[in-house]
Amino acid sequence: MSLFPVIVVFGLSFPPIFFELLLSLAIFWLVRRVLLPTGIYDFVWHPALFNTALYCCLFYLISRLFV
């Protein structure tokens, strides 16, 4: 159960997990932008799978912070 209530914006209700998803997406973009110039993607076998796993890990960490 999250600490945040359901938020209503212009008649649309958003569950608290929606904002956790957006926050983890923003952090994912920042981390990916930092990792691209380092050349780490040259060692990654499947970049799309790596990006998905990275996003899932970030979402897990963010969601653990708000529980």
Curated annotation (Swiss-Prot):
Topological type in the membrane: Multi-pass membrane protein
Keywords of this entry: Cell membrane, Membrane, Transmembrane, Transmembrane helix
Domain of life: Bacteria
Induction info: Positively coregulated with aaeA and aaeB by AaeR.
Transmembrane annotation, as ranges: 3-23, 43-63
Cellular-component GO terms for this entry: plasma membrane
Entry's localization field: Cell membrane
Assigned protein family: Belongs to the AaeX family.
Protein name in UniProt: Protein AaeX
